[in-house]
Amino acid sequence: MNKILYTLAALLAVAVTAHAALEAGEAAPQFEARASLDGKAFDYSLAEALEDGTVVVYFYPSAYTQGCNIQAHEFSVNMDAFNEAGATVIGVSLDDIERLNDFSADPEYCAGNLAVASDPDGSIAQSYGLEVRGAVDGAEDTRGEEIGHGFAERVTFIVTPDGRVAETIGGVSPMQNVKMTLAAVQGLNQ
């Protein structure tokens, strides 16, 4: 009986830590991905972006879903404030690049101001310690189109030019996530 309890406890510990998001002070995994800005695909490199300053890397479940639409819109309308604080922003989801081309140009969401990157197999999200769930049969977006891909957790990482995570923000509403992220980025310069 004790052996069974020990085994269950060990498995639970592995399961919990397997999806523990990176914390402040940890090295942020570098990544390169296809991304889109204002409907145009390009090759994104976190290492190159960090040469210009702090980078907000925010993971979201899927383009054109309720919470993600709100979050993208809020990042987009606050982009000048992020830039003034010395930060750029990149959204990351398991959406394919064609879908992100539409999302990045959509005037209601990214509005051409917010770059979004494609992580089709979830490997970038997993490298940040995030849980990636499989596709849900029949799941549709706010446009009524089938989503057809998996989902990463909604978590935001603020990565400083030295490649370290300054703060991890998760477990809050999409709008609150953006507000907290902006406040944290602005606080880095004080």
Predicted regions: what is each one?
Residues 111-114, 130-138, 149-157:
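Structural micro-motif
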Residues 46-47, 130, 171:
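Residue-level structural signal for beta-strand termini and adjacent loop
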Residues 32-54:
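A short beta-strand-turn-helix
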Residues 46-75:
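Short active-site neighborhood of thiol/selenol oxidoreductases, capturing the structured segment around
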Residues 141-190:
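Thiol-/selenol-based redox modules, centered on thioredoxin-like
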Residues 69-127:
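Structural microenvironment flanking redox-active thiols in thiol-disulfide oxidoreductases
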Residues 5-35:
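N-proximal helix/coil linker or "cap" segments that precede and/or mark the start of modular domains
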Residues 37-38, 121, 162:
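Residue-level recognition of short loop/turn positions
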